């Protein structure tokens, strides 16, 4: 069974140049969606928007395909994970630090991402997927009984004594 999950990562430690580049790319993309006039948007973002969002006049963020995003683990004080976001005019893109995540990106496959700006801060919504085996038998089962005398009674399979709540 395939499981999908969206991880919300804040971009931290942005320099003024990186923030200006991301703001320019974000604003130019939104302007291109509204008017159709290209003020300098990365071409792959335009291709995705033409294909996916034919009727959208404004979007929540900039969609990023999985082949355009690169998330790697680095041993730095700023952040454990770094992402490379493609921007028009910068060869190779902009390397940004992702806020400390209790998530292991190496164990999952990265699908697509969305670059979002909220209150002047940038967030990267990364969608990941993984194939997991469905369990057919569980080791611990908890039964909850809602009653009139006791609000709730729970019994775990491995424990023989019930717990009374109420």
Model-predicted regions and their roles:
Residues 1-166:
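Nucleic-acid substrate recognition interfaces
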């Amino acid at each position: 069974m395939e499981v999908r999950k969206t991880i919300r990562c804040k971009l931290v430690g942005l320099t003024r140049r990186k923030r200006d580049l991301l703001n320019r790319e974000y604003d130019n993309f939104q302007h291109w969606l509204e008017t159709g006039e290209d003020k300098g948007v990365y071409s792959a973002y335009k291709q995705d928007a033409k294909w996916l969002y034919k009727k959208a006049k404004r979007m929540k963020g900039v969609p990023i395909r999985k082949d355009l995003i690169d998330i790697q683990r680095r041993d730095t004080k700023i952040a454990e994970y770094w992402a490379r976001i493609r921007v028009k005019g910068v060869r190779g893109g902009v390397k940004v630090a992702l806020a400390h995540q209790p998530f292991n990106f190496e164990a999952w496959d990265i699908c697509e991402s969305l670059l979002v700006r909220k209150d002047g801060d940038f967030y990267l919504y990364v969608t990941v997927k993984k194939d997991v085996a469905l369990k057919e038998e569980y080791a611990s089962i908890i039964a909850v009984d809602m009653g009139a005398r006791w609000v709730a009674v729970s019994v775990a399979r491995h424990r023989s004594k019930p717990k009374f709540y109420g």
